[in-house]
């Protein structure tokens, strides 16, 4: 969709093909320019006269910091990983390359890209055109100078606006069909299969996919607290934003400040390839997002025609499945390319997905997936409207009107001291009555499976909704308060216990369910602060940085009691564990002792013991139940003893000693030398949630967790913000800004975020670069 940059030759890169929507945009292009002012940690403050110029500055600055990252993601969303890296390797998200390619070839067809582009208003098109031109300008300069080593390869090329659309559509389906990549790619009718045709590699891929789906909310979780004037220390709004997102890849946040004088002035963080702010603040308000528990897709069980397993019965009539041929270029062992075709089958609801043992395609049934966000072409308009909002009402009205938020909640505050929560996103319009009539109650509500043989079981259509088949915003949870609202990836029910949000469709929010440990921590902490006075900025920062392990308060006393009286013949073997637990400070700080590691192992083992709680969950007391380990029950005591013994063995096997500290174990090495990282597993009630994978020498490498942090309040002049980008601004290990904020985060050093002209120009690291086409 964008013309080639004049004056630059890219050696070794193929000539671009004509893009589907190119004719739509040729007349809209004009020269662009921007001023990029960098302050501490290399954060860019980009100023331009219009959207095209602003996009130009964003794309240019982003490529300076993250060229290899975006180039890699462009390969992914074009379905070209098998072409460049081979079919059997995996993406950063551990998706099989071939499966990933099939999904994106199907998702990002020329028609889908053209339709999305056509739906964008001129402002969004100009932002995207500018971004492409700016990125390509930086690429040309870096190509001349020598590309960074990780991407000095043939797969790096100039991008187009189609590529930005592909990236955006990839983000949209993260909460839907994107979670079923392997199940999508592996769907074949039974007549064409060898016995089940599930080889060991496919089994492993599906197992990884299942684990990844379960981790979705953890990897893309979040905490947010919005404090209103009745509770804030300064009588104004106060916001804590603590999204938990991946530290690498296509969901890695980028910090920036965007200004079009007289029209836009917003600072915060954005996901790769997006020319706007997703989480941030402006002169009037501040906001954040948390991944919601709402359902953004449904599965439809197809009753197959007994004569043909590629036909299904709908209202008694036999209907042929759609067949779409997708071809993936695959790199062979000798380096040549081979086109591998694959047929994608679909019903009127969406593509057929197959998960052996879970969602089988046999001669009786198959399962089709309908993703609500496939028709969401409003997402970029939504965030740009939020970025420009000059009041909380305008902000809220934009979310109601556009309905472009894909799979997150929104929490916001304004300078007047209002605190807002909205569980408004793109959710299938299926109420409790229809769900009871059209689904098997034995399946539960973790996956919504509707009867695909009856049209009446499809999604309802509301004239009030921005898109056919989704819930209108008026029927989704929202709450405006002057004390507080908070959220940590539970349902909307207990956002504020003084005003429970109840009786919504099970696809939107379920009440009466146990809260996660982080929500319990937040509500308990806010209640304590409310009793002792007002909430300050420092209080909100401490919620993240003091690294309290909330779950320890519920079970550690019983663990110590068990250590003191129930060890018997295992006393000597368990003595180091019990000593470490007693000495542990109950936190996930860098200096926290080995007792924290033992505690994690024990709790993980005990998750499988259904009778472990002394006090079971009580919907009337959701903040403080369940609690207490029922060590007086023989089955619990037996399981606990086994868990403790296993923990001792695991710690010994990892080579950890009694003197090991948490900061010796949990690290980030993405920029080179390991940096110790505080925080820990979200399931333990650690607000500063971190997800890790096994590293070398018993270490744990952070892959996801606390990412962009901001605490924002207001005075008579506007916003006062402090923040951090935990993994730093640049993903290039050679950059000066690949580890500086990570080191600051490790030391718990927040930074004042310069927002006004005076603050920006007074910054000691202030530098200016003017870029023009």
UniProtKB/Swiss-Prot annotation:
UniProt keyword annotation of Hydrolase present: yes
Residues that make up the propeptide removed upon maturation: 200-221
Gene3D superfamilies documented for this protein: 1.10.1400.10, 2.30.120.10, Glutamine Phosphoribosylpyrophosphate, subunit 1, domain 1 (3.60.20.10), Penicillin Amidohydrolase, domain 1 (1.10.439.10)
InterPro entries: Ntn_hydrolases_N, Penicillin_amidase_A-knob, Penicillin_amidase_dom1, Penicillin_amidase_N_B-knob, S45
GO CC terms in record: periplasmic space
Catalytic activity, reaction form: an N-acyl-L-homoserine lactone + H2O = L-homoserine lactone + a carboxylate
GO annotation terms (biological process): antibiotic biosynthetic process; quorum sensing
Enzyme Commission no: 3.5.1.97
GO function terms (MF aspect): hydrolase activity, acting on carbon-nitrogen (but not peptide) bonds, in linear amides
Annotated keywords: Hydrolase, Periplasm, Quorum sensing, Signal, Zymogen
Active-site residues (renumbered): 222
Classification via Pfam families: Penicil_amidase
Extent of the signal sequence: 1-23
Subcellular compartments: Periplasm
Family listed: Belongs to the peptidase S45 family.
Other observations noted: AHL-mediated signaling mediates quorum sensing in many species of Proteobacteria, regulating hundreds of genes, including many that code for extracellular virulence factors.
The protein's role, per its UniProt record: Catalyzes the deacylation of acyl-homoserine lactone (AHL or acyl-HSL), releasing homoserine lactone (HSL) and the corresponding fatty acid. Possesses a specificity for the degradation of long-chain acyl-HSLs (side chains of 11 to 14 carbons in length).
Subunit structure: Heterodimer of an alpha subunit and a beta subunit processed from the same precursor.
Name the UniProt record assigns to this protein: Acyl-homoserine lactone acylase PvdQ
Gene that encodes it: pvdQ
């Amino acid at each position: 969709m964008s013309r080639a940059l004049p004056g630059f030759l890219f050696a070794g890169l193929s000539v671009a093909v004509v893009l589907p929507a190119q004719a739509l945009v040729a007349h809209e292009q004009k020269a662009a320019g921007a001023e990029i002012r960098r302050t501490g940690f290399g954060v860019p403050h980009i100023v331009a006269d219009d959207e095209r110029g602003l996009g130009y500055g964003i794309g240019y600055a982003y490529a300076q910091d993250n060229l290899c990252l975006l180039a890699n993601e462009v390969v992914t969303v074009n379905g070209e990983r098998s072409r460049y890296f081979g079919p059997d390797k995996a993406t950063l998200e551990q998706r099989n390359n071939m499966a990933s390619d099939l999904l994106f070839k199907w998702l990002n067809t020329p028609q889908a890209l053209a339709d999305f582009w056509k739906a964008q208003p001129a402002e969004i098109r100009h932002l995207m055109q500018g971004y492409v031109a700016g990125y390509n300008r930086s690429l040309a300069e870096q190509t001349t100078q020598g590309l960074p080593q990780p991407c000095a390869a043939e797969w790096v090329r100039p991008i187009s606006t189609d590529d930005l659309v592909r990236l955006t559509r990839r983000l949209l389906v993260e909460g839907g069909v994107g979670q079923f990549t392997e199940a999508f790619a592996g769907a074949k009718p039974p007549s064409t299969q060898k016995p089940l045709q599930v080889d060991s590699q496919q089994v492993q891929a599906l197992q990884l996919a299942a684990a990844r789906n379960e981790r979705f909310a953890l990897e893309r979780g979040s905490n947010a607290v919005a404090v209103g004037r009745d509770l804030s220390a300064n009588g104004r709004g106060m916001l804590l934003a603590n999204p938990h997102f991946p530290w690498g890849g296509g969901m890695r946040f980028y910090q920036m400040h965007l200004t079009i004088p007289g029209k836009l002035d917003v600072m915060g963080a954005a996901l790769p390839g997006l020319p706007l702010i997703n989480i941030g603040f402006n002169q009037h308000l501040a906001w954040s997002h948390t991944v919601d528990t709402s359902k953004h897709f449904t599965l439809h069980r197809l009753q197959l025609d007994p004569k043909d397993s590629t036909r299904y019965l709908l209202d008694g009539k036999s209907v042929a499945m759609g067949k779409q041929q997708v071809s993936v270029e695959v790199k062979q062992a000798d380096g040549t390319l081979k086109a591998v075709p694959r047929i994608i089958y679909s019903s009127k609801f969406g593509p057929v997905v197959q998960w052996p043992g879970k969602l089988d395609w046999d001669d009786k049934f198959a399962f089709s997936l309908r993703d609500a966000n496939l028709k969401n072409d409003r997402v970029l308009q939504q965030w740009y409207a939020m970025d420009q909002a000059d009041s909380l009402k305008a902000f809220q009205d934009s979310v109601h009107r556009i309905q472009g938020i894909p799979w997150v909640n929104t929490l916001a505050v304004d300078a007047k001291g209002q605190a807002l929560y909205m569980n408004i996103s793109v959710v299938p319009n299926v109420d409790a009555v229809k769900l009871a009539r059209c689904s098997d109650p034995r399946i539960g509500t973790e996956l919504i499976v509707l009867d695909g043989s009856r049209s009446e079981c499809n999604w309802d259509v509301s004239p009030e909704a921005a898109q056919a088949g989704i819930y209108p915003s008026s029927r989704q949870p929202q709450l405006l308060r002057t004390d507080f609202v908070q959220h940590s990836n539970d349902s909307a029910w207990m956002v504020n216990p003084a005003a429970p949000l109840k009786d919504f469709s099970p696809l939107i929010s379920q009440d009466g369910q146990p809260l996660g440990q982080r929500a319990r921590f937040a509500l308990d902490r806010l209640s304590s602060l409310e009793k002792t006075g007002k909430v300050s900025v420092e209080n909100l920062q401490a919620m993240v940085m003091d690294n309290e392990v909330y779950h320890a308060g519920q079970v550690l006393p019983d663990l110590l009691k068990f250590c003191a009286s129930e060890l018997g013949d295992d006393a000597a073997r368990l003595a180091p564990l019990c000593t470490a637990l007693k000495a542990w400070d109950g936190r996930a700080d860098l200096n926290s002792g080995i007792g924290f590691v033992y505690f994690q192992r024990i709790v993980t083992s005990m998750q499988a013991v259904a009778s472990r709680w002394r006090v079971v969950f009580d919907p009337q007391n959701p903040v403080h139940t369940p609690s207490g380990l029922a060590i007086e029950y023989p089955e619990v005591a037996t399981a606990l003893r086994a868990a403790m013994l296993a923990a001792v063995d695991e710690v010994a096997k990892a080579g950890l000693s009694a003197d090991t500290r948490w900061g010796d174990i949990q690290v980030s090495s993405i920029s080179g030398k390991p940096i110790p990282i505080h925080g820990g597993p979200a399931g333990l009630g650690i607000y500063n949630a971190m997800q890790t994978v096994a590293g070398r020498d018993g270490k744990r490498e952070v892959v996801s967790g606390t990412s962009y942090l901001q605490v924002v309040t207001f005075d008579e002049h506007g916003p006062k913000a402090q923040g951090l980008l935990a993994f730093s601004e640049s993903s290039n290990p050679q950059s000066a800004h690949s580890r500086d904020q990570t080191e600051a985060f490790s030391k718990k050093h927040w930074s004042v975020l310069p927002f006004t002209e005076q603050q920006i120009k007074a910054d000691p690291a202030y530098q200016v670069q003017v870029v023009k086409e």
